[in-house]
From Swiss-Prot:
This is Globin. Oxygen binding protein. Signal peptide: none annotated. The lineage of its organism: Eukaryota, Metazoa, Spiralia, Lophotrochozoa, Platyhelminthes. The keyword Iron applies. It comes from Isoparorchis hypselobagri (Giant trematode). Pfam families: Globin (PF00042). It comes from the Eukaryota. Monomer. Residues 2-149 form the Globin domain.
Amino acid sequence: MVLTKDEFDSLLHELDPKIDTEEHRMELGLGAYTELFAAHPEYIKKFSRLQEATPANVMAQDGAKYYAKTLINDLVELLKASTDEATLNTAIARTATKDHKPRNVSGAEFQTGEPIFIKYFSHVLTTPANQAFMEKLLTKIFTGVAGQL
């Protein structure tokens, strides 16, 4: 178990207004990808729906909106699995196989996103405890996925 039930409940309670609709999930995901692509514009070409995008226009692309929703949908699935180690490990394996292996992302490349996403979510979340819970979850996810790439 990565998160206790109380940690999960607290984190979900704070995140809920940001993940309660597809529009909110897209906005949250766009923010995360804005930070990732600012730090690593070379990653844009790893996404099949962003092949024509440039760093200047990537976030306006329909593909970016698609990936933003997908990112947060996957994160919510991983969060929901976070109180059971076996379920979380299965979900991590699924995201590695489904989303990252087909893009030829190396474990080292994937790991570069960890501090970016931790920083992003530390700004999204206002409660220090929830920031710590999210960091713990993201560290588990990034380490787990990178280990399978």
